[in-house]
Amino acid sequence: MAAPLGGMFSGQPPGPPQAPPGLPGQASLLQAAPGAPRPSSSTLVDELESSFEACFASLVSQDYVNGTDQEEIRTGVDQCIQKFLDIARQTECFFLQKRLQLSVQKPEQVIKEDVSELRNELQRKDALVQKHLTKLRHWQQVLEDINVQHKKPADIPQGSLAYLEQASANIPAPLKPT
């Protein structure tokens, strides 16, 4: 197996440790990077989850409801959000490193994934085209029906006199006073 790619780019922390030998295919999923101040059993996913919960906890904390200074509240919330964003970046970096390792070790797998994504996108777009064609046929039929209705001259009497005769036939006769 290739060496970890951590530290390859400037400013990046070294990558996470490799999977234990007895568990092929299972990287010690997102274990904390060496040198980071984390408990040994903690993973990036656990930290991401706890920092996410801390963000909400800071927003609904009873301490803030009891009239704490607005600036103090803002500072506390900003710190929680910043911690969450930092851990999210570390998690993203981990997955990008794993993706890079995969592309180096198994380039055919990356190509297969790309082809699969392209097929899925083509299917989605084909379905969308079919949906639009169905709507187009429906509205073409509606327009055709309207045109057919306007072309039936037998139903409408010709001339203004015929129109007045038809309209007056529908008016009820006045009642005679008694």
From Swiss-Prot:
It is a peripheral membrane protein. Residues 1-44 are annotated as: Disordered. Induction: Up-regulated by endothelial cells when exposed to tumor conditional media. GO terms for biological process: negative regulation of smooth muscle cell differentiation; positive regulation of transcription elongation by RNA polymerase II; positive regulation of transcription initiation by RNA polymerase II; RNA polymerase II preinitiation complex assembly; somatic stem cell population maintenance. Signal peptide: none annotated. It is found in: Nucleus; Cytoplasm; Membrane. GO terms for cellular component: core mediator complex; cortical actin cytoskeleton; mediator complex; membrane; nucleoplasm; nucleus. Keywords: Actin-binding, Activator, Coiled coil, Cytoplasm, Membrane, Nucleus, Transcription, Transcription regulation. GO terms for molecular function: actin binding. Widely expressed. Highly expressed in vascular tissues such as placenta, testis and liver. Its main location: nucleus. Residues 13-23 have a biased composition (Pro residues). Residues 109-145 form a coiled coil. The keyword Aminoacyl-tRNA synthetase does not apply. Component of the Mediator complex, a coactivator involved in the regulated transcription of nearly all RNA polymerase II-dependent genes. Mediator functions as a bridge to convey information from gene-specific regulatory proteins to the basal RNA polymerase II transcription machinery. Mediator is recruited to promoters by direct interactions with regulatory proteins and serves as a scaffold for the assembly of a functional preinitiation complex with RNA polymerase II and the general transcription factors. Component of the Mediator complex, which is composed of MED1, MED4, MED6, MED7, MED8, MED9, MED10, MED11, MED12, MED13, MED13L, MED14, MED15, MED16, MED17, MED18, MED19, MED20, MED21, MED22, MED23, MED24, MED25, MED26, MED27, MED29, MED30, MED31, CCNC, CDK8 and CDC2L6/CDK11. The MED12, MED13, CCNC and CDK8 subunits form a distinct module termed the CDK8 module. Mediator containing the CDK8 module is less active than Mediator lacking this module in supporting transcriptional activation. PANTHER family: MEDIATOR COMPLEX SUBUNIT 28 (PTHR13512), MEDIATOR OF RNA POLYMERASE II TRANSCRIPTION SUBUNIT 28 (PTHR13512:SF2). Belongs to the Mediator complex subunit 28 family. This is Mediator of RNA polymerase II transcription subunit 28.
